[in-house]
């Protein structure tokens, strides 16, 4: 283990963070395709950039530790893509896009919160990145009322 990552829990937490960032980025790409609302598009772009920065930070720490990068599960990626396509095909409005973003953020917050609880021995740098991701997810989630 590198001195940059103190223990195995830190690696596991960062791997969950990077997988979550990748899921979020793919979901935002999928939703952006169905979005013509300028305000919602700007929100997606802002948090897309933040998730990208978080992903790079995780990757850098994992690379320094010589740890593998975790990919989101194939089933989870396909299910998210299919859900977005189906829901937007039925109701292709900005409120639906905002709801999908909110649902994704809620799942991400749950997942990262669970990882923080599970990997209690993670070092402070890894925990700080996970907390940044959780905060980013919280603020990414738009209110459907804001897009009407």
How would you name each of these model-derived features?
Residues 39-75:
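Conserved alpha-helical segments that form or flank metal/cofactor-binding pockets of metalloenzymes
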Residues 60-109:
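Carboxylate-rich helix-loop segments that flank metal/cofactor sites and access channels
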Residues 37-38, 123:
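Short loop-to-helix capping motifs
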Residues 41-49, 76, 99-102, 127-132:
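Short, charged, amphipathic alpha-helical segments
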Residues 114-132:
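Acidic interhelical loop/turn segments
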Residues 139-148:
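Single conserved hydrophobic/aromatic residue that forms the stacking wall/gate
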Residues 3-35, 96-120:
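Alpha-helical bundle segments that constitute or directly flank the non-heme di-iron/ferroxidase center
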